[in-house]
């Protein structure tokens, strides 16, 4: 059976519970068509690079699917009808990845960032609070610039 990676974006004003309900609905469509969903990953609410249907943020969800093309086409048709789905993309793959996706690994890495400092005090140059300018010298005196065409 063909394998697919499917990502869809749901509107930000939809609750996480409603997104889970949508996933269950689409899972039912795939299973009715004779396929299975191997993995579901919710990437959470993320900012979009540009506005899509007047939304600046969206719930991102990944589905790894093993199903006949007709079942995937029916799921995509239902997503096109739904007002809560902003965008979706389905890609056929040779093999599904067993480990967490890059987005989940990135989230895990971001979660570890805060615990690295432990109970050590803040550094002097944290948060642009100053610090050494490295090997850059002083800018020195600069001539006044004239922008009005006046000489």
Curated annotation (Swiss-Prot):
This is Small ribosomal subunit protein bS6. Keywords: Ribonucleoprotein, Ribosomal protein, RNA-binding, rRNA-binding. Binds together with bS18 to 16S ribosomal RNA. The keyword Ribonucleoprotein applies. It comes from Methylorubrum extorquens (strain PA1). GO terms for cellular component: cytosolic small ribosomal subunit. One of its GO terms (biological process) is translation. Transmembrane segments: none annotated. InterPro entries: Ribosomal_bS6, Ribosomal_bS6_sf, Ribosomal_S6_plastid/chlpt, Transl_elong_EF1B/ribsomal_bS6. GO terms for molecular function: small ribosomal subunit rRNA binding; structural constituent of ribosome. Pfam families: Ribosomal_S6. Residues 105-151 have a biased composition (Basic and acidic residues). Residues 97-151 are annotated as: Disordered. It comes from the Bacteria. Belongs to the bacterial ribosomal protein bS6 family.
């Amino acid at each position: 059976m063909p394998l697919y990676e499917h990502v869809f974006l749901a509107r930000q004003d939809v609750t996480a519970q409603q997104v889970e309900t949508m996933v269950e609905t689409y899972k039912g469509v795939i299973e009715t068509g004779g396929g299975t969903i191997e993995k579901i990953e919710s990437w959470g609410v993320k900012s979009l690079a540009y506005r899509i249907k007047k939304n600046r943020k969206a719930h991102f969800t990944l589905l790894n699917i093993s199903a006949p093309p007709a079942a995937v086409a029916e799921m995509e048709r239902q997503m096109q009808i739904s007002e809560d789905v902003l965008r979706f993309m389905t890609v056929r793959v040779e093999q599904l990845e067993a480990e967490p996706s890059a987005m989940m690994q990135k989230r895990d890495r971001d979660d570890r960032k805060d615990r690295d400092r432990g109970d050590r005090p803040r550094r002097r140059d944290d948060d642009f609070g100053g610090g050494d300018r490295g090997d850059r010298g002083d800018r020195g005196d600069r001539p006044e610039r004239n922008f009005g065409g006046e000489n």
